[in-house]
Structures are given as structure tokens and as C-alpha cells.
């Protein structure tokens, strides 16, 4: 086992864990300030460029970086590191189970979001565990499963740009079209297919408070699992995604 605290936010609020979970991943875990009551878990899945063994890579962009830049989120943030290859849903669940066993977690509020390789991981994880994932957001990715009938149970928002040269927008199209062909269609799906958006642009969504507010609108206690209304994601809105963030302050507590 190896763990250390990050510099940049208070000690013990962000800790890296290595070799902690058998058949799992090394991971960062951010702990919110108030932990006397059960808190949601937000799982962030990174893209291929952050794969490896250097765990500080995972802090380069995404939800952990957003927290370090001042975005306060009233939830545990779980950010595993993939050493390489596709994300494995079973390994992710092993890590999540460790968090649930060792912290006060609200199991009705488990959220996952990721981009590129992490977008694939998000789709595959939600497809595998639709009864565990409360809501999900997948950016510029796709999916590796053959069937998506279980995915239609999950409130899901997919974002992909038509100018993506790393992962073709057709990969998201395949998932969306497969979901729509399932019995009952895809009533819990939002799909933003954005003209002219590049591969890297959706990374800015991780820094928007609206991203987490949208996730927190969902809870497994809602038997209908109604999908919350969208907020606006466009090339224009993403340009101002960092407008209220600073690495030197914490602002805008987002409550579940």
C-alpha cells in the first residue's frame, strides 16, 4: 500500500491510494469537508493520455483538477488511474466497493463521467451496472458492448463534436442509435452532437458547476429515474467554463 496527500488543497482531503484494492485500480479520493452524513460519489474516468503509473497525471484535467482550482463539490470524488487499455467495469466496481466499505457513502447517488477513453469507460460501466449508477455523462467516447438495453435505464448525457479527429463522432452515434432501437427507446438520454467541436473541447465541461448540479438532480430513490433538463453546452459556453475558478480559492459549493 502507498498513499500520499496532494499539495494544493487541505491535507487529507485529497489522497492517492496505490495497491489498496485487489483486482482494482490505483486511485485518487477527494473527501468533502463534512462527512458526518452519507455523501454521493462522483467517479471521474480519464482519457488515454493520462494512463500509466504516474498518478499525478490524473490531476492534469477533470474533476480532481476542478476541485483543486476551487470547484467545491459536496461529494467524494473518485478518480482511478488506468495503467493502459480499456477501462474494466468490474475493476472500477471493486474500487467503488472499497470506498463504500471505508466511508459514509450515499449509495443512491453514485455518478460517473469521463471523456475519450473515459467516455468509453463511462458507457461500459453504466451499461454493466445500471442499478448502481445514478446518472452518467460521457464525452467524445463510445462503447464496447454489443447491447445497450440496460443503459436505457440510466439518465445519461452524451456529448461529442463533429470535428473530433481523435475519436469519430460516429462512435457516439453507434451507441445512441443502438439505445434508440431498444424496446421503449431511450427516454433518459440526452445527446449533444455539436457541429465544429474538437476532441479536447468537452474537457471544459468538468469545470462547470452546472455539470455537477445536473448529476445531483438524479437519485435512485426516484423509481421513474427521470432525466433532468439539460443546460447549454456549446463551443461558446465552454469558452467561459473557467470564469469563476482560481487555484487560490474555493467557490461555489455544489450540494446534492
Language-model region placement:
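A domain-start/cap signature at the N-terminus of enzymes
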Residues: 7-41, 75, 120, 125-128, ...
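Active-site machinery of serine-nucleophile hydrolases
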Residues: 39-41, 45-92
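Short beta-strand/loop motif that positions the catalytic acidic residue
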Residues: 152, 157-160, 164
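Active-site-adjacent alpha-helix of alpha/beta-hydrolase-fold enzymes
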Residues: 63, 162-190
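Short beta-strand immediately N-terminal to the catalytic nucleophile in serine-hydrolase-like folds
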Residues: 112-114, 139, 159
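Histidine-bearing beta->alpha loop at or near hydrolase active sites
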Residues: 77, 161, 191-201
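Gly/Ser-rich "nucleophile elbow"/oxyanion-hole loop immediately N-terminal to the catalytic nucleophile
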Residues: 34-37, 86-116
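A conserved short beta-strand
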Residues: 132-142
Amino acid at each position: 500500500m502507498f498513499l500520499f496527500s496532494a499539495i494544493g488543497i487541505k491535507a487529507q482531503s485529497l489522497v492517492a491510494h496505490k495497491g489498496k484494492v485487489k483486482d482494482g485500480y490505483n486511485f485518487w479520493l477527494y473527501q468533502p469537508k463534512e462527512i458526518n452524513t452519507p455523501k454521493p460519489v462522483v467517479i471521474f474516468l480519464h482519457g488515454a493520455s493520462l494512463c500509466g503509473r504516474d498518478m499525478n497525471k490524473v490531476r492534469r484535467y477533470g474533476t480532481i483538477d476542478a476541485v483543486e482550482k476551487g470547484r467545491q463539490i459536496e461529494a467524494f470524488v473518485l478518480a482511478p488511474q488506468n495503467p493502459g487499455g480499456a477501462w474494466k467495469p468490474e475493476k472500477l466496481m471493486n474500487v467503488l466497493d472499497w470506498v463504500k466499505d471505508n466511508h459514509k457513502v450515499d449509495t443512491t447517488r453514485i455518478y460517473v463521467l469521463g471523456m475519450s477513453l473515459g467516455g468509453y469507460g463511462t458507457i461500459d460501466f453504466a451499461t454493466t451496472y445500471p442499478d448502481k449508477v445514478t446518472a452518467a455523462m460521457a464525452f467524445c467516447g463510445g462503447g464496447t458492448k454489443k447491447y445497450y438495453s440496460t443503459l436505457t435505464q440510466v439518465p445519461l448525457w452524451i456529448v461529442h463534436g463533429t470535428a473530433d479527429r481523435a475519436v469519430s463522432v460516429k462512435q457516439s452515434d453507434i451507441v445512441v442509435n443502438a439505445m434508440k432501437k431498444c424496446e421503449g427507446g431511450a427516454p433518459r438520454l440526452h445527446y449533444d452532437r455539436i457541429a465544429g467541436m474538437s476532441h479536447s473541447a468537452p474537457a471544459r465541461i468538468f469545470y462547470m458547476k452546472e455539470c455537477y448540479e445536473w448529476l445531483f438532480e438524479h437519485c435512485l430513490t426516484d423509481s421513474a429515474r427521470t432525466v433532468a433538463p439539460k443546460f447549454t453546452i456549446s463551443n461558446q459556453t465552454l469558452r467561459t467554463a473557467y470564469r469563476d475558478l482560481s487555484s487560490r480559492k474555493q467557490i461555489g459549493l455544489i450540494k446534492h
